């Protein structure tokens, strides 16, 4: 049993140790550095010791200005505005790349014993640092000529972290390869096809041969992104020098030679692999947007190799021979360009390395040293000459560009929306089923009088015609740049030869072709149209005649054999729905450059001196002229949809989307060349040493007459294998911008209305859109007295109907009345998944040995001087590896979501007295009996509201609406083929008082969610040891967040629509009242302009005594109006400076009506009524107001003014939330407001400025500090702004976070939630060898709750970002979090602060506490000794702080191995302490107040009839006068809202927070807060992780187990 117990105990101990170790490892944070991968492989025996150190600096700066003028016209419903926008954008981008590398390797030479070891081991050391800084500052200015002005977008800048990886590779000659991957924004490729034929100058018949050389040279020039202009596209700007483009010039040539005699002979083939970039490239272009006239740059060209056959002059006494020389020319050009004087000064510093090769001859002498390891082979020395030249040239860039564009304007005319309506067409098929369709139609009314009988027709024509049209654009761009060449330059060594070169004079022509979709319009045949004269009579009685074409149709109706013909017409003013799209536009351009380089080296002597080798070489040459012609085709294809407009409209919702779409693709060429070169030569040269010039030789020709006899025995083998592989995939660039998408969603709910008429209950089921947030119960009593005279057989019997109707309706309405979504999605990207891949494989292997014997013979003295020189040189493998991988990702996602706007009427007092007098004259058989109906409705209600921040007290001001309308309806009732016309004339008088101020707009619930995605791409550069190439991978990740600027405002919710004939009379019944409460927080005045109406058709069927009468009526559709109000109020403020703040708003309203049918049966008579319910309009609010608290308000207003002023800010002395109202004394137009003395500061105040700006800037540099600044401000929504600035020098770091104090003031908003989350990921490798930067997301959660009882509960918990920086192991920066919890509860009389706790780290200070239970904290302390941790103490703390001061020490033994045995070599003491703290906070119960809303509605309609007279001529030439009328029915609804307060008590759950903390030790700090919250209130967990390291013990588990077993025993 003891053994089993021992095993169980051992298992427990092992399990505990495993858990403890896991816990220790959990807190360990190891900082790993990313090593630069290094690959060194030497497998050749003749690899000499070599070291290469290169420093590469690259900097480029470019800027472009993009002006554009955009003009758009938007027409929807009754809103039409034109806003030509002129935008000018300028960007200045500068980048710098500095790379330095050091590499050294060593291996033995020809040691067979150690060759195996050399090929496997190599010592290398490297040091690489890379810094890339990019700064972009666009400046945008916009101007609009409309009534509103778009906000100016603030400058934004983006940061681009970069990481560079350097890889060094050295392989054997048979597997040497070089790869180069690059990605550029543009590519320019050229192909040179040339054919040359050369004949050697030898006179030997056997060696006399000629060969033709054909080759293809392909050059690819990839410059930086050039300037882009919207009006003119420049393929390649000729005004900029080549070096200022900061591009890579890749030149590859392939020469294939074929001899004429078809003999097997190796022809020299040269592959110029200059695509490996120049060793040193310093390019800087200073061309700011302001326009500088001076540009200085220096440019070092890559080594260029030229080959030529030089024929030696032959003589009878000298055996001629042919030799070939390959020269390598490298130059450094330092030029400065002064644009002001248009002159350029160029300084050349060039060096020529000439490598002659000798042909095979008799081997006379062999250097014994060169025989080692090879068989009779030696390598000829390389002679290098340096020369410099200076030249001045007039750089006269004359560029002329002419562009012509032709556009065909198009215009579309549509019907006035007031003349259209939605018509429900019921179609009955043969089976008897009814199908209803809804379509827009044009309504017209015609009245026909025949023999004194007036017949009125109401017809409509469906709007079904469409017109599609497209725009044709043709443009041509031509540019002719001119540049003068250099005046001339000479080699500063000998005047016997000249070297002249002329600049390139490119001639580029661009031609563009575009394809567009034509549009055509279909119209009616002229045979179906006629000219109709429309006579319009206004209210004054004047007649206006207009002539318009109309579409005439004839309808024939046969009833019992009687044929009736109807003639109707529709004016030809149908609307057109159109979709405009440009299908494609293809632009192909060909740029032809004709460079001419003439190298004149006459027959004279070219003497080159080299100071390094102290040798002078004289070469006799003949004339050689090189001329090349380059044709550079550039193709560009793009597909662009300039403007795509799609408009669709449904009965309940409408959507409008417009977006420009542009996509383009570019392509480049791919070149793959494989070549092998083997050639030899014979020449005379001085003996030189490349590495260490210890021997000086001089060879001078005394005179021209002297002939040189030389005998050279040289054997040389050179193998050049070059593989150039370039892959450049098509570059896709798509720019899709969905600027505005408006979709309206209507929520309808069913309601049941019970009507009791004379004791008979009738139930109606109707539907109306949701327009409130509560249950509405309306009870109304209406008494209607109707006097109707029914005539039958010339006898009329009057009938009096008295109807008492009691209506009770309960409508459950949803919380969202309408939804307006303004989404702005900008997707801009340039993707090149495969980037550009260039692989260059170059292998050079050369072995040579030569023995030369030279004899100088002079013709005058006949003396000969002989000298011998022999040189053996071996060139090892030179391999290059260039690999550059660039990935470019443009990802921009921006979305703006605006939820719906809830509006309700609060705290209003409505007193209305309405008297309606309807006089109806019923005529039958030429007898008219007048009927007078008088209805007096008086309603008075005083609702109450608990909110006081935006309390609206309405003054007793009445606005009387007086209208006089006359309705004339003519109905023809047909029965048994006998039709009796009936004319009904209705004269209506209405005088309606209207409250001046009836509504107060609440705060809008607008939440903004803006997501930004910043993707940082890395770059890798790999280049070899022996070549100082420029590894350039400039990856630009552009982050552009397009800000959609919209203006929105709330609609004036006044339920009054007036026609043009109405009169507005504003009277003030109480001008001398001193107790009339008045608040200027929000005021609306009646619109005084005439508004056209849109009508909806309805049909009513009435059956009286078996006679069915069909009435066709229509009700107006409330138009969508645009109100741009700008109010400027000057206020005299005490203790404040007088300020004048303008306020502007833009509102759009769309109200539609839907038809409903009600059937009523009274005394067996069935009556069908067709009614309509208005669809609640969509409205958005956006106001810009900056006000301050006022103690004295002076208001000057007129009844006809349209002003909107919304105050959303309060000062420190704001009104108390206890319900106090400010009372003002008004006298005339001056009001003095009395502010109560009691005031309290609200818990939170929301104050924001009306601007939307997003800006971020960053810069990374090794020498200066790194700054990352981001500012995000989104207004007028809930404040979500954060400013983060991180400074990261090489050794220290600092992070400061400033969050604006959340402030909120609301009076009607139940709940508003705003969450702002910003994530910044910055990566820059390598920053430093001992530093790592980590930024955590910054999240800020703000929730504002506003209850109806003036009880405000605000909680703002912002988690500060944690920063982990470990520049060294011993230094750790810790930033403690701060938590602030504030709860404010207000009662009807006072406000008191219950709990206010401020916590800093783990210490909390209690400011004021009335909680029922104080927080109890239980602290558990865990002690770790060695690898065992156990719980030692447990303490309970009351209050808000617990202190643990115990410190525990633990020792660890670290073992080190030396030799075969191991012994303890070091003992260290580590301190570790972990504290587990649990805090429980039980808050007190919160009592809030709920509001029950009751509303009562009263509806009275106003009918307006406008007479219209049509005059037309029939086929007989007789004039026919037809009188029609348009009827307007305007419902006036008065709603009284009553509120009732109900107390609601809620008890939050206790909040438990548990966190574990490691106390400070020598190894660092690791703290983790874990918050477990379960409550109904707001709890924000705070998670902070700090960089540190925990001690990891090098003890064996087995050792610990044995110790435990021994102890147990």
UniProtKB/Swiss-Prot annotation:
Name of the protein described by the UniProt record: Factor-induced gene 2 protein
Lipid bilayer topology? Lipid-anchor; GPI-anchor
Q: How is it modified after translation?
A: N-glycosylated.
Record keyword Zinc present: no
Q: What triggers its expression?
A: By mating pheromones. By cells of the opposite mating type.
Give residue spans, biased composition: Polar residues: 137-148, 196-212, 286-312, 1231-1243
Keyword tags: Cell adhesion, Cell shape, Cell wall, Cell wall biogenesis/degradation, Conjugation, Glycoprotein, GPI-anchor, Lipoprotein, Membrane, Pheromone response, Secreted, Signal
Q: Where is this region: Disordered?
A: 129-165, 196-243, 266-312, 846-876, 1231-1259
Sum up the protein's function in the record's words.
Required for efficient mating. Plays a role in maintenance of cell wall integrity during mating. Important for mating cell projection shape and conjugation bridge diameter. Plays a role in cell fusion and nuclear migration.
Which Pfam families is this protein grouped with?
Answer: Flocculin_t3
């Amino acid at each position: 049993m003891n053994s089993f117990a021992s095993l169980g105990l051992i298992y427990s101990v092992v399990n505990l140790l495993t858990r403890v170790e896991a816990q220790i490892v959990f807190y360990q944070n190891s900082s790993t550095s990313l090593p630069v991968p290094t690959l060194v492989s030497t497998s050749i025996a003749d690899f000499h010791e070599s070291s290469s150190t290169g420093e590469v600096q690259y900097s480029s700066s470019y800027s472009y200005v993009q002006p554009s003028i955009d003009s758009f016209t938007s027409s929807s419903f009754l809103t039409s505005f034109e806003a030509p926008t002129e935008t000018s954008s300028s960007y200045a981008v500068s980048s710098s790349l500095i790379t330095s590398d050091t590499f050294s390797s060593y291996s033995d030479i020809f040691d067979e014993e150690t060759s195996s070891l050399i090929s496997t081991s190599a010592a290398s050391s490297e040091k690489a640092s890379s810094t890339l800084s990019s700064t972009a500052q666009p400046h945008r200015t916009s101007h609009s000529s409309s009534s509103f002005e778009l906000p100016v977008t603030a400058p934004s800048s983006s940061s681009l972290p970069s990481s560079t990886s350097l890889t060094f590779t050295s392989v054997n000659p048979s597997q040497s390869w070089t790869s180069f991957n690059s990605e550029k924004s543009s590519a320019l490729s050229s192909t040179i096809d040339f054919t040359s034929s050369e004949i050697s100058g030898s006179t030997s018949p056997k060696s006399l041969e000629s060969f033709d050389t054909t080759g293809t040279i392909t050059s690819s020039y990839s410059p930086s992104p050039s300037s882009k202009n919207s009006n003119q596209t420049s393929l390649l700007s000729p005004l900029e020098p080549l070096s200022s483009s900061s591009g890579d010039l890749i030149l590859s040539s392939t020469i294939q030679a074929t001899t004429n005699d078809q003999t097997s002979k190796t022809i020299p083939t040269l592959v110029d692999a200059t695509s490996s970039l120049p060793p040193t490239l310093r390019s800087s272009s200073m061309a700011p947007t302001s326009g500088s006239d001076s540009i200085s740059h220096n440019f070092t060209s890559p080594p260029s190799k030229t080959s030529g056959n030089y024929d030696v002059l032959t003589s009878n006494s000298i055996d001629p021979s042919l030799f070939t020389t390959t020269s390598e020319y490298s130059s450094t050009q330092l030029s400065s360009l002064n644009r002001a004087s248009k002159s350029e000064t160029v300084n050349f510093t060039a060096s020529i390395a000439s490598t002659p090769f000798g042909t095979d001859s008799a081997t006379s002498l062999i250097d014994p040293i060169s025989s080692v390891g090879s068989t009779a082979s030696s390598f000829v020395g390389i002679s290098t000459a340096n020369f410099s030249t200076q030249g001045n040239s007039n750089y006269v860039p004359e560029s002329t560009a002419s562009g012509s564009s032709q556009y065909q304007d198009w215009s579309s005319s549509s019907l006035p929306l007031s003349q259209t309506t939605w018509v429900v067409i019921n179609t009955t098929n043969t089976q008897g089923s009814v199908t209803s369709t809804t379509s827009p139609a044009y309504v017209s009314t015609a009245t026909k009088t025949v023999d004194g009988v007036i017949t009125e027709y109401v017809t409509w024509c469906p709007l079904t015609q469409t017109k599609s049209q497209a725009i044709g654009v043709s443009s041509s761009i031509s540019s002719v740049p001119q540049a003068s060449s250099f005046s001339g330059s000479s080699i500063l060594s000998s005047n016997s030869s000249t070297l002249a070169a002329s600049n390139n004079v490119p001639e580029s022509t661009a031609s563009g072709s575009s394809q567009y979709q034509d549009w055509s319009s279909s119209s009616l045949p002229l045979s179906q149209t006629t000219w109709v004269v429309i006579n319009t009579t206004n209210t004054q009685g004047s007649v206006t005649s207009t002539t318009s074409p109309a579409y005439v149709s004839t309808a024939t109706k046969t009833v019992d054999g009687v044929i009736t013909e109807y003639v109707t017409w529709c004016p030809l003013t149908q609307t057109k729905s159109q979709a405009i799209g440009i299908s494609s536009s293809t632009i192909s351009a060909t740029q032809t450059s004709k460079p001419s380089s003439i190298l004149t080296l006459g027959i004279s002597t070219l003497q080159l001196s080299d100071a390094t080798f102290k040798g002078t070489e004289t070469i006799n040459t003949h004339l050689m002229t090189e001329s090349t012609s380059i044709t550079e085709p550039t193709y560009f294809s793009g597909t662009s949809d300039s403007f795509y407009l799609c408009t669709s409209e449904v009965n309940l919702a409408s959507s409008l989307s417009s977006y420009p779409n542009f996509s383009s693709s570019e392509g480049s060429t791919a070149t793959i060349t494989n070549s092998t070169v083997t050639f030899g030569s014979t020449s005379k040269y001085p003996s030189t040493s490349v590495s260490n010039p210890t021997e000086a030789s001089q060879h001078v020709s005394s005179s021209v007459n002297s002939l040189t006899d030389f005998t050279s025995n040289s054997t040389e083998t050179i193998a050049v294998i070059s593989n150039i592989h370039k892959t450049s995939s098509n570059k896709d660039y798509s720019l899709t911008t969905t600027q505005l998408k408006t979709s309206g969603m209507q929520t309808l709910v069913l309601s049941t209305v019970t009507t009791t008429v004379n004791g008979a209950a009738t139930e109606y089921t109707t539907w109306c859109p949701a327009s409130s947030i509560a249950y509405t119960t309306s009870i109304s009593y209406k008494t209607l007295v109707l006097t109707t005279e029914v005539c039958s057989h010339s006898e009329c019997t009057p009938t009096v109907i008295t109807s008492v109707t009691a209506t009770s309706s309960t409508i459950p309405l949803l919380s969202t009345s309408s939804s307006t979504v303004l989404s702005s999605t900008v997707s801009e990207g340039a993707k090149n998944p495969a980037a550009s891949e260039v692989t260059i494989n170059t292998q050079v292997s050369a072995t040579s040995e030569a023995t030369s014997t030279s004899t100088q013979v002079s013709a005058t003295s006949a003396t000969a001087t002989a000298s011998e020189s022999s040189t053996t040189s071996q060139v090892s493998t030179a391999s290059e590896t260039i690999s550059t991988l660039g990935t470019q990702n443009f990802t921009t996602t921006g979305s703006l979501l605006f939820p719906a706007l809830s509006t309700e009427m609060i705290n209003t007092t409505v007193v209305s007295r309405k008297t309606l007098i309807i006089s109806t004259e019923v005529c039958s058989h030429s007898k008219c009996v007048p009927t007078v109906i008088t209805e007096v409705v008086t309603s008075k209600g005083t609702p109450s509201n608990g909110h006081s921040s935006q309390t609206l007290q309405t003054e007793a001001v009445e606005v009387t609406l007086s209208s006089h309308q006359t309705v004339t309806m003519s109905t023809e009732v047909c029965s048994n083929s006998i039709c009796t016309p009936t004319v009904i004339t209705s004269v209506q008088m209405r005088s309606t008082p209207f409250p001046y101020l009836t509504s107060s707009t609440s705060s809008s619930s607008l939440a903004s969610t803006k997501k930004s995605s910043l993707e940082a791409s890395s770059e890798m550069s790999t280049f070899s040891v022996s070549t100082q190439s420029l590894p350039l991978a400039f990856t630009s990740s552009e982050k552009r967040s397009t800000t959609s600027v919209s203006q929105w405002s709330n609609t004036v919710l006044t339920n009054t629509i007036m026609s043009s004939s109405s009169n507005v009379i504003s009277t003030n019944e109480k001008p001398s009242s001193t107790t009339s409460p008045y608040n200027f927080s929000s005021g609306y005045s009646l619109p005084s302009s005439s508004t056209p109406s849109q009508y909806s058709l309805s049909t009513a069927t009435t059956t009286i005594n078996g006679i069915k009468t069909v009435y066709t009526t229509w009700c107006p559709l409330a138009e969508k109006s645009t109100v741009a109000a700008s109010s400027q109020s000057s206020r005299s403020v005490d203790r404040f400076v007088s300020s004048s703040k303008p306020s502007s708003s833009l509102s759009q309203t769309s109200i539609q009506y839907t038809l409903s049918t009600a059937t009523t049966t009274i005394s067996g008579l069935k009556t069908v009524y067709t009614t309509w319910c208005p669809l609640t309009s969509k409205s958005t609010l956006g106001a810009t107001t900056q006000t301050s608290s006022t103690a004295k308000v002076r208001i000057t207003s007129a009844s006809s003014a349209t002003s909107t002023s919304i105050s959303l800010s309060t000062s420190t002395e704001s009104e108390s939330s206890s319900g106090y109202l400010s009372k003002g004394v008004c006298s005339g137009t001056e009001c003095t407001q009395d502010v109560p003395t009691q005031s309290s500061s609200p818990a939170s105040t929301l104050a924001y400025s009306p601007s939307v700006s997003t800006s971020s800037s960053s810069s990374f540099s090794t020498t200066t500090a790194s700054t990352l600044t981001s500012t995000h401000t989104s207004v007028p929504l809930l404040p979500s702004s954060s400013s983060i600035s991180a400074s990261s020098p090489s050794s220290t770091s600092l992070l400061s976070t400033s969050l604006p104090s959340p402030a909120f003031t609301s009076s009607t908003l139940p709940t508003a939630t705003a969450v702002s989350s910003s994530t910044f990921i910055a990566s820059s490798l390598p920053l430093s060898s001992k530093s790592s930067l980590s930024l955590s997301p910054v999240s800020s959660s703000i929730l504002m709750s506003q209850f109806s009882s003036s009880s405000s509960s605000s909680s703002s918990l912002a988690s500060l970002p944690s920063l982990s920086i470990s520049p060294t192991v011993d230094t750790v920066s810790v930033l403690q979090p701060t938590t602030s919890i504030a709860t404010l509860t207000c009662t009807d009389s006072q406000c008191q602060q219950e709990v206010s706790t401020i916590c800093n780290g783990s210490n909390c200070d209690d400011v004021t506490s009335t909680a029922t239970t104080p927080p109890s904290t239980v602290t558990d302390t865990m002690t770790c000794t060695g690898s065992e941790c156990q719980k030692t103490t447990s303490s309970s703390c009351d209050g808000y702080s617990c202190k643990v001061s115990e410190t525990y020490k633990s020792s660890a033994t670290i073992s080190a191995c030396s030799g075969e045995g191991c012994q303890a070599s070091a003992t260290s003491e580590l301190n570790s302490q972990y504290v587990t703290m649990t805090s429980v906070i039980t808050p007190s119960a919160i009592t809030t107040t709920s509001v029950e809303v009751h509303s009562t509605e009263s509806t009275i309609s106003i009918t307006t009839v406008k007479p219209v007279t049509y005059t037309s001529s029939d086929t007989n030439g007789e004039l026919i006068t037809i009188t029609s009328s348009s009827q307007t029915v305007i419902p006036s609804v008065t709603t009284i809202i009553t509120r009732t307060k109900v107390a609601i008590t809620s008890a939050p759950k206790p909040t438990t927070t548990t966190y574990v903390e490691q106390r400070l030790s020598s190894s660092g700090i690791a703290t983790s807060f874990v918050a477990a919250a379960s409550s109904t209130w707001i709890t924000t967990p705070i998670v902070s992780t700090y960089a540190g390291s925990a001690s990891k013990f090098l003890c064996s588990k087995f050792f610990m187990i044995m110790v435990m077993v021994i102890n147990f025993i």
